[in-house]
Amino acid sequence: LAPGGATATAWRMADEVWDAIDREAGTGVRLSAAEHFVTITDHELVTSRGIHARDVSTHLAVEIALIARAEAGSSDDEAETFRPVEARRLADLRLSAHVAEAATFARDTLRAEATPTHDGAVVIASGALPALFDPFLFHTGAQAAVMKLARFAPGDRVTDGGDPLHLASDSTRPFGLGSHAFDGDGVP
C-alpha cells in the first residue's frame, strides 16, 4: 500500500485514473464512472498442535467506465466501455495503460462494422486473453478437482486435435491474486 494506508492508496488510484483521462482530452472520450476498492485482509491461523501463522494481504480493484462520442456535444453516436482491473499491489494495476487501452477500444467501437466471413488466423488482444482462459484456470485448479468439477486432470488433452496447449499454474507467485501463505483451510 501507499504510505498512509488504504485511504492514501485509494486516492493515488483515483489520481492515476484522472491523469490518464486528462491525457485523453480532445479525443472524444470521457470518464463516465469509476469505483476504487482497497481491501486489506489479515488471516491468523492458530492450531492445537502449536502452529501459528499469519498472512496479511491486499486486494486492489478499480472499475472504469468510459464513453466515446463521435462529435463533441452529440449524444447520437456514443460507445461505452467498461474496464475492471485487479491487483495485489498498486504498481501492478497499470491504470494509465488500462485507461488508454479502454479509450482506444471505446473510440474504435464507434467505427466498428460487421466483418465479412473470414477463414484464417485470428488475433486476440491481450485484454481478451484472461477472459478466454478463465474456464481453463478454473478447471485446472485444485479447488475444482477437490469439488469434482474439474474437466481436466494432469496430462489430459484440452483439445481433440491441433497443437497441444500446455497449462500451468503457480500459486506461490508473489502478489498473484490467488497467492497467499496458506489457503482458507490453513494448507500452505
Language model features by range: what are they?
Residues L1-H180:
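Active-site bordering "gate/hinge" segments
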Residues D183-P188:
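Short, intrinsically disordered, charge-balanced linker/junction segments flanking boundaries
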